Amino acid sequence: MNRTIPPPIKDAVEFDIKLKPYEKFTLDNGIPVYVIKSEEQDTLQLELVFPAGSWYESESLEAAATNFLMKNGTSKRTALEINESVDYHGAYLNRNAYHENATFTLHCLTKHTEVLLPVLQDVIQDPSFPEEELALYKQNQKQKLAVNLQKCDFVANRFIDKYLFGDFHPYGRVSSMMAYDALQTETLRAFYQKHYTYNNCRIFVAGNMPANMLALLNKHFGTTRWNGESSLIRPELPIQPAEEKKFRIFNDENGVQGAVRIARPFPNRYHPDFPKMLVLNTIFGGYFGSRLMSNIREDKGYTYGIYSQLYNFRQVSAINIQTEAGRDVCEATIEEVYKELQQLQNVPVPQEELDLVRNYMIGSILGDLDGAFQVIQRWKNLILNDLDENYFYNNIQTIKNITAEELQQLAKQYYNPGDFYELVVI
């Protein structure tokens, strides 16, 4: 080997990316299990997913509260005992409630799987929702809300979603002191009984599994029809966006910083323009070298960071441009955002910039597939949205092959300043 000669540089777009296929098993009671095996490290990730997000709420906050309190006590274990069991084995048991789904995720060493699965089973199948835990949850969440409501960026995030989707839509509905006060144990138990059932459960496993992993899963989750059977119909909920487009809110009259949000509705991931828009959004504001960062951060110095993102909601998406800037330059920041929108409409993206973004996006995907935990997350995202590997590969081809002319047409269609909601919170 001649070490005076550097190895050839290979662009990310030249890599032939393959999404490692999963193995699928079915427990005795019908629960599907999706598996990505890896023996690189003696660690395991086990995630249970339920259709128990805010989309299915009849009362505000019941999805998040139910999900949180399931880990805070069962008929056999107190919250302290659950946490001590997990911590003693160096593991993590996390729970999250999103718009559509709710999850429980266990990370542990492979050798501790058999000891920890009974704890997870207890949390999923036998939560007791203690009154004192609900009271503590309300108190803590109200304190957090009171603190966050003093922050302009938190307030801006709440309002922009309300403007885009409406006060009563799950994507636009926000927490409140009254909503926390209204939470009742009976309501949470009813939500739990309806949504956390065996036939609504899907299991995703990644990492180095013990040899008897499937037998263990079957023992704890597959032998009975726990919590009964519940047939859920995903309701169609109307979106009611605000009629006005421009808003200025003074949350703190003496504030020196403002939170800027510029956003518009956009079709969801099933629309053919969505993969193309991911490329345009990256050029515009999706990475550190974007148009917005180069102009508003590097050139003008108005902010430490400005980004544009595409929401990945199931019903409808949105384009959201967000930053925090000095109070006296918020309006100037908005003007520069619109200038960059119009620049993409009027001038094709130079080939050098497009090639750079292609390599950045493909490189990011390569990084996202580094390891079994990352691969199962990619598959989970596809499976939960009724998509397959063709969607993944089509997106890669879009990144590699989209032209500057196509991007310019997208900008003309979706980057019209008059279509955007505009919000400043100081």
Question: What do the predicted segments below correspond to?
Answer:
Residues M1-P6, T26, E81-L232, P267, ...:
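Charge-rich, well-structured scaffold segments of protease-associated domains
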Residues M1-I82, R189-N295, I334, F420-I426:
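His/Glu-rich zincin catalytic helix
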